[in-house]
Amino acid sequence: MSEFSPIFIYLVMSLLVSLILLGLPFLFASNSSTYPEKLSAYECGFDPFGDARSRFDIRFYLVSILFIIFDLEVTFFFPWAVSLNKIDLFGFWSMMAFLLILTIGFLYEWKRGALDWE
């Protein structure tokens, strides 16, 4: 056995579990026809007031992307903060450079008006 066999076994098992979980709904689902009422949007027993697939303003998507980017930034800070006493000066300054790049990006987004809701 090579040293990569546990990784291969893990990948095969995860593929099998994924395929089983994808196939189970097709096995247990009923083949009854769907009614138009089941496909329509539910609004507390009333007829729908508008289209259920209304458009969102692009700013919502922009704010969500910015949140994801800066939320991932925090995941880099946790291991750095935990191992701060074990890393040397290079690790400290590399994280400061990372923080500087993110701060410049945040200031650029702010300057361009990506965070303004006018």
From Swiss-Prot:
It is found in: Mitochondrion membrane. It is a multi-pass membrane protein. Keywords: Electron transport, Membrane, Mitochondrion, NAD, Respiratory chain, Translocase, Transmembrane, Transmembrane helix, Transport, Ubiquinone. The chain crosses the membrane at residues 7-27, 62-82, 87-107. GO terms for cellular component: mitochondrial membrane; NADH dehydrogenase complex. Its EC number is 7.1.1.2. It catalyses: a ubiquinone + NADH + 5 H(+)(in) = a ubiquinol + NAD(+) + 4 H(+)(out). InterPro entries: NAD(P)H_OxRDtase_bac/plastid, NADH_UbQ/plastoQ_OxRdtase_su3, NDAH_ubi_oxred_su3_sf. The keyword Endoplasmic reticulum does not apply. One of its GO terms (molecular function) is NADH dehydrogenase (ubiquinone) activity. Belongs to the complex I subunit 3 family. Core subunit of the mitochondrial membrane respiratory chain NADH dehydrogenase (Complex I) that is believed to belong to the minimal assembly required for catalysis. Complex I functions in the transfer of electrons from NADH to the respiratory chain. The immediate electron acceptor for the enzyme is believed to be ubiquinone. This is NADH-ubiquinone oxidoreductase chain 3. It comes from Allium cepa.
